[in-house]
């Protein structure tokens, strides 16, 4: 019995779009993946921070979700830059098919770098603004 074939482009896309909730981990490893569940815990944790610290800056309220998405962007790059041979050995050993990456994956990785680096740099800048000036610059 052959297993389903795991698509590297789809896994990278899930990591970029829904990675903050662990969708890529659940696609690759199943519904009980511990790191996927850790990603999923970012949403209730964000809700708890919002409920407990209502007077806090919105950046701090969204920080668990921001961290989860930054990690997911990194995972999208790792997934997308894995060679097809290593990908098939790790995820498609019993599927009977081989993977072949195309230009869609390359565009997705470029977009991931653009968005991921922007989010990371903006988060670091806002964090230092809040910690050192109390939010005086915005």
Where are these predicted regions, by residue range?
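Membrane interfacial helix-start motif at the N-side
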Residues: 1-10, 14-36
């Amino acid at each position: 019995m052959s297993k389903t074939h795991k698509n590297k482009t789809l896994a990278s896309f899930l990591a970029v779009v829904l990675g903050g909730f662990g969708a890529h981990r659940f696609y690759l490893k199943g519904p009980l993946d511990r790191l996927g569940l850790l990603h999923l815990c970012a949403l209730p944790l964000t809700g708890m921070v919002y409920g407990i610290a209502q007077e806090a800056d919105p950046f701090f309220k969204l920080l668990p979700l921001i961290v989860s998405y930054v990690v997911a962007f990194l995972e999208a790059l790792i997934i997308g830059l894995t060679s097809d041979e290593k990908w098939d050995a790790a995820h498609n050993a019993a599927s009977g098919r081989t993977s072949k990456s195309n230009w869609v994956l390359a565009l997705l990785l470029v977009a991931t770098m653009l968005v991921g680096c922007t989010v990371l740099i903006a988060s670091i800048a806002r964090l230092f603004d809040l910690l050192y000036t109390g939010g005086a610059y915005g």
